[in-house]
C-alpha cells in the first residue's frame, strides 16, 4: 500500500480504497481530509501544518487539489471526499460501536445524535468551544477519559479540527483511538 502514498509538503496522502484507509487507522490515529483552501495556508499556519504532517492518513477530499497534482506533478489520484468516507464508515463499521461526536453547536449535536440513533449507533456528544490558539481542552479530555469510545468524529471547522485531533491523539496515544476529521 505504500506505493499509494503521495507526499505533499511532508503530508502523507493515501490514494487507496476505503478498506485500506480504514486499516491504516485500525490501531489508532487520525484521518484528515483537508480542503484546497486550507492547504494553501500551511505556510502561514504552522500549528495546522504540523497537525497534517502528523496525521495517520490524509485523503484527497479536494477535487481542485487532485487536478493541481495532475497538472503540475503529473500525478493522477482519485478524489475521496471526507463525506463519502464518513458515510461508508457509518454504514459499515460503526454498528455496535461507540462514537464521540465533537460538534460546533447544540443544533449540530442534536442532529448528529438523532442520526446516530436512527443508525443504531451508541453516541456521545461534546459541544466544542471556539478554539483560537490553545487546543488543549481539559473538559474534552476528561470526557474522553470517562467514556470508552471506539471512534471520535470531529465536526468543527477545518484548520481547527485537525489540530484538535493532533492534541487528542497525542494525549491518548495508548488508547488507540480512531479519530476522523471530515469537516463541519
Q: Where would I find each of the regions flagged by the language model?
A:
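Conserved beta-alpha
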Residues: 66-143, 147
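Structural motif
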Residues: 31-33, 59, 100, 151-155, ...
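Short, conserved loop/helix-junction motifs that constitute active-site signature segments
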Residues: 50-53, 94, 170-175
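Short Gly/Thr/Asp-enriched flexible loops that form oxyanion-binding sites at enzyme active sites
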Residues: 113, 161-172
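Proline-aspartate-enriched helix->loop->beta-strand connector
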Residues: 144, 148-158
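N-terminal nucleotide/polyanion-binding subdomain common to many enzyme families
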Residues: 1-78, 83
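Short, flexible loop segments at boundaries between secondary-structure elements
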Residues: 128-132, 175-184
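Short glycine-rich anion-binding loops that position phosphate/pyrophosphate groups of nucleotides
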Residues: 36-39, 156-160
Amino acid at each position: 500500500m505504500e506505493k499509494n502514498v503521495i507526499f505533499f509538503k511532508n503530508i502523507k496522502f493515501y490514494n487507496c480504497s476505503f478498506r485500506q484507509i480504514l486499516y491504516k487507522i485500525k490501531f489508532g490515529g487520525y484521518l484528515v481530509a483537508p480542503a484546497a483552501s486550507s492547504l494553501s495556508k500551511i505556510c502561514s499556519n504552522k500549528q495546522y501544518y504540523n497537525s497534517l504532517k502528523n496525521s495517520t492518513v490524509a485523503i484527497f477530499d479536494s477535487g481542485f487539489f487532485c487536478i493541481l497534482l495532475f497538472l503540475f506533478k503529473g500525478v493522477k489520484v482519485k478524489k475521496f471526499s471526507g463525506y463519502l468516507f464518513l458515510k461508508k464508515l457509518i454504514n459499515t463499521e460503526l454498528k455496535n460501536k461507540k462514537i464521540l461526536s465533537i460538534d460546533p453547536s447544540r443544533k449540530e449535536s442534536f442532529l448528529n445524535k438523532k442520526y446516530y440513533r436512527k443508525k443504531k449507533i451508541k453516541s456521545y456528544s461534546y459541544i466544542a468551544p471556539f478554539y483560537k490558539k490553545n487546543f488543549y481542552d481539559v473538559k474534552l479530555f476528561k470526557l474522553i477519559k470517562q467514556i470508552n469510545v471506539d471512534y471520535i468524529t470531529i465536526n468543527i471547522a477545518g484548520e481547527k479540527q485537525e489540530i484538535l485531533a493532533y492534541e487528542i491523539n497525542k494525549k491518548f496515544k495508548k488508547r488507540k483511538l480512531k479519530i476522523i476529521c471530515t469537516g463541519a
